Amino acid sequence: MKKAVCLLSGGMDSTTLAFVAKKMGYDILALHVNYGQRTERKELEAAKKVADVLGVVEFLEISLDYFKKFGASSLTDMNIEVEAGVLGRADNPNTYVPFRNGNLISIATSYCESRDGEAIFIGVQSGDHTGYPDCTPRFIEAMQHAIYVGTQTEKSIELLTPFVMMNKTDILKEGMELCVPYEHTWSCYSENDEACGVCSSCLARLKAFADLGMEDPIPYKK
């Protein structure tokens, strides 16, 4: 059976993508990275629940401490408040973590190569293109080239991003067809128990459910 590393944060996009990868016939090697984010505890809890439902071959948890030392993002620097979200925002959000996905993809590549895997899945989507340069098609193309050049595998590892040109509503629609357990997922940038409902990630998630005439199954602050 072919194997793939799925970067699994426990959020909507990465969870749906892991189910897509399984549907494509891959055995799933789930990679969850704690990088000092505010919602580290809840994201890990969500990722483990999703991994159990998926029946992954392996669940690997990696912890990084250097992003907190770098700061510069409201997700990792507790002195910077997570700003209220605005749908369709065009400028740089303070929730951007400098080159985070470059780091995560590099770790996933090492993991994939060590397990003789064939692919890496990361859930970047169109709503992240503005303000998050490490979520763009151009960035993914560059990282794919680096993987080709920098690995020894006889069969090239593919960096797969099926959602890169899809919005969150379309992702949710696909996930519902795959019976993704969204009640186990977590998207909020700031809270670990009840989602705030006002950060950009919460707003995008709520909009997706509203677009499909559905109620989000996770708890929100009143």
Curated annotation (Swiss-Prot):
InterPro entries on file: QueC (IPR018317), Rossmann-like_a/b/a_fold (IPR014729)
* Positions with a binding annotation for Zn(2+): C188, C196, C199, C202
Q: In which pathway does it act?
A: Purine metabolism; 7-cyano-7-deazaguanine biosynthesis
Which EC numbers does the record give? Answer: 6.3.4.20
The molecular function terms in GO held by this entry are: ATP binding; ligase activity, forming carbon-nitrogen bonds; zinc ion binding
The record's catalysed reaction(s) read:
7-carboxy-7-deazaguanine + NH4(+) + ATP = 7-cyano-7-deazaguanine + ADP + phosphate + H2O + H(+)
Task: Alphabetically list the UniProt keywords.
Answer: ATP-binding, Ligase, Metal-binding, Nucleotide-binding, Zinc
| Free-text remark on how the cofactor is bound | Binds 1 zinc ion per subunit.
Q: Does the keyword Nucleus apply?
A: no
This protein's record includes keyword Magnesium = no
The cofactor named in the record is: Zn(2+)
Q: Which CDD domains match?
A: QueC-like
**What residues bind ATP, as annotated?**
L8, S9, G10, G11, M12, D13, S14, T15, T16, L17, A18
Known Gene3D superfamilies for this protein?
Answer: HUPs (3.40.50.620)
List the PANTHER family.
7-CYANO-7-DEAZAGUANINE SYNTHASE (PTHR42914:SF1)
What family does the database annotate?
Answer: Belongs to the QueC family.
Q: What does this protein do?
A: Catalyzes the ATP-dependent conversion of 7-carboxy-7-deazaguanine (CDG) to 7-cyano-7-deazaguanine (preQ(0)).
**Protein name in the entry:** 7-cyano-7-deazaguanine synthase
Q: Which organism is it from?
A: Methanocorpusculum labreanum (strain ATCC 43576 / DSM 4855 / Z)
